[in-house]
């Protein structure tokens, strides 16, 4: 009985394509958030900026808004980037184990929850990103089933 398998080529390309789609959706959403003045004004009215924000100009507040958008962007794309890079090394040099699948499923669920908790649900890019995360979870579960099928042979 083998505890690890080589990553199937189709599964690797599926995982990388889903990660690319998630990154693209997140990029488009952050681009729209950073450049829309209505969203900036909504951010000003809903955010709890504190006392020092009263003395800042609109230009300084917009700079703060852009920094928040960029920080959020990097936090959201780190997980799909890491999944794609680790899958590449697993596909070319390493083997897939149950531990690989379990750890990435937990991390992807956490990234999905982080995205789900902090977004507007009416955004088409949020919906696309959520579908991408669910597809990535199902791809990892399929990879786990491939390991079980090879082990039972």
Write out the residue ranges for each language-model feature.
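Cytosolic juxtamembrane helix at the C-terminal end of the final transmembrane segment
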Residues: 6, 34-37, 85-99, 135-153
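Cytosolic juxtamembrane helix and N-cap/initiation of the first transmembrane helix
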Residues: 1-38
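A loop-to-helix transmembrane entry motif
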Residues: 39-44, 57-82
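Loop-to-transmembrane helix junctions at the membrane interface
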Residues: 69-108
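Alpha-helical transmembrane segments of multi-pass integral membrane proteins
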Residues: 110-153
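Short, highly charged, low-complexity non-transmembrane loops/tails of multi-pass membrane proteins
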Residues: 43-50, 151-153
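Membrane-helix interface and helix-disruption motif detector
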Residues: 64-71, 95, 117-128
């Amino acid at each position: 009985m083998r505890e690890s398998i080589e990553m199937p080529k189709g599964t690797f390309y599926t995982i990388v394509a889903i990660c690319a789609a998630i990154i693209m959706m997140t990029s488009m959403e952050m681009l729209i958030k950073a450049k829309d003045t209505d969203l900036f004004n909504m951010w000003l009215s809903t955010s709890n900026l504190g006392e020092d924000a009263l003395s800042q100009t609109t230009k300084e507040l917009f700079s703060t808004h852009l920094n928040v958008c960029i920080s959020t962007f990097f936090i959201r794309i780190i997980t799909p980037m890491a999944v794609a890079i680790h899958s590449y090394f697993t596909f070319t040099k390493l083997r897939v184990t149950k531990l690989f699948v379990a750890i990435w499923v937990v991390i992807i669920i956490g990234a999905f929850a982080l995205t789900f908790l902090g977004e507007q649900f009416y955004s088409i890019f949020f919906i696309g990103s959520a579908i991408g995360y669910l597809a990535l979870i199902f791809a990892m579960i399929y990879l786990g089933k491939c390991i079980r099928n090879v082990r039972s042979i």
